[in-house]
From Swiss-Prot:
The lineage of its organism: Eukaryota, Metazoa, Chordata, Craniata, Vertebrata. Interacts with pbx1 isoform b. It comes from Xenopus laevis (African clawed frog). The keyword Membrane does not apply. This is Homeobox protein Meis1. It is found in: Cytoplasm; Nucleus. One of its GO terms (cellular component) is transcription regulator complex. Residues 299-329 are annotated as: Interaction with DNA.
Length: 390
């Protein structure tokens, strides 16, 4: 009878290594029925053998006692079956796989896996064969035990599959987050770097350059709003370009720290660049110089963006984003400040001196130039608050 189950495909590797007998205990040891007295109130294991078990109250006392004796014999035969320790083991594995938190990589985490149960089957079969046969003399009970073990094993495989799907989802979700977070960090660094660049510019721009920028900007606004430039305005446009270039040189000198011999240190240069943002210092200086040379229209064309990208070593997208931030944080505050000065009825003068003439440190006396045909128009347009910059 036992030979029918020797070649079952579900239990490959029935021959294995030895296992201490204390792991499973003696399957034929006497068991106390006090621990399972509640089973007497449940349905019988084989209802077809006891068709009147549901009406025990109507039975004679002698017949009720015989039914209870039969149930006790069935329980004893199940508890004493050679495969019962294996059934209890896989039931415990299913319970652990359901309620135990899983931590991959932790020692002992595979104690409830299906592979571990395959090893347990091999160990159990070798141990039990050395002591007694695997099956009893009751084929029906043997079949019941085999089917119960199969059902629990399928359940264990399903639980393992659910855990694999959960782990796969968590891994993919974490990978997706890790792949997107660096982009967000780069955007934050880029915004922070542009903000620090604009703050450095407003702090380091020399006060002596601001009046010349104001006059140049007034002339540029008058040219854009008045139409064709007059003779005097044309000559002053070149002077504006010269002032812008001088301002760019002054900007570079004001930002650069005094030469102490440590500027050649590449490590300190990297730290300085990292503190200022993601763009190198040389690249921001080049783009600032271009911005102040084209304040009347600070919108570089595609060709100019390509040229700036080559000069700075940045990408076209980085150059474009820098100019977007610069127009918002550098150019616009200057325009707002000029508009406030014009709305008060006097031209912009940071030192509070008359526009007729003043002397700055290290420069000769400067007087206002003779008003040309376009400069008067620019002043009128400025007084009316109708300047057009971009």
């Amino acid at each position: 009878m036992a030979q029918r189950y020797d070649d079952l495909p579900h239990y490959g590797g029935m021959d294995g290594v030895g296992l201490p007998s204390s792991m499973y205990g003696d399957p034929h040891a006497a068991r106390s029925m006090k621990s399972v007295h509640h089973l007497n109130h449940g349905p019988p294991l084989h209802p077809h053998q006891y068709p009147h078990s549901a009406h025990t109250n109507a039975m004679p006392p002698s017949m009720g006692s015989s039914v209870n004796d039969a149930l006790k014999r069935d329980k004893d035969s199940i508890y004493g079956h050679p495969l019962f320790p294996l059934l209890a083991l896989i039931f415990e594995k299913c319970e652990l796989a359901t309620c135990t938190p899983r931590e991959p990589g932790v020692a002992g985490g595979d104690v409830c896996s299906s592979e571990s149960f395959n090893e347990d089957i091999a160990v159990f079969s070798k141990q039990i064969r050395a002591e007694k046969p695997l099956f009893s003399s009751n084929p029906e009970l043997d079949n019941l035990m085999i089917q119960a073990i199969q059902v629990l094993r399928f359940h264990l495989l399903e639980l393992e599959k659910v855990h694999e799907l959960c782990d796969n989802f968590c891994h993919r979700y974490i990978s997706c987050l890790e792949g997107k977070m660096p982009i967000d960090l780069v955007i934050d660094d880029r915004d922070g770097g542009s903000k620090s660049d604009s703050e450095d510019l407003t702090r380091s721009a020399p006060l002596t350059d601001q009046p010349s920028w104001s006059r140049d900007h007034d002339d540029a606004a008058s040219i854009r709003s008045g139409g064709t430039p007059g003779p005097s305005s044309g000559g002053h446009t070149s002077h504006s370009g010269d002032n812008s270039s001088e301002q760019g040189d002054g900007l570079d000198n004001s930002i650069a720290s005094p030469s102490t011999g440590d500027d050649d240190d590449p490590d300190k240069e990297k730290k300085r660049n990292k503190g200022r943002g993601i763009f190198p210092k040389v690249a921001t200086n080049i783009m600032r110089a271009w911005l102040f040379q084209h304040l009347t229209h600070p919108y570089p064309s595609e060709e100019q963006k390509k040229q700036l990208a080559q000069d700075t070593g940045l990408t076209i997208l980085q150059v474009n984003n820098w100019f977007i931030n610069a127009r918002r944080r550098i150019v616009q505050p200057m325009i707002d400040q000029s508009n406030r000065a014009v709305s008060q009825g006097t031209p912009y003068n940071p030192d509070g001196q008359p526009i007729g003439g003043f002397v700055m440190d290290g420069q000769q006396h400067m007087g206002i130039r003779a008003p040309g045909p376009m400069s008067g128009m620019g002043m009128n347009m400025g007084m009316e608050g109708q300047w057009h910059y971009m």
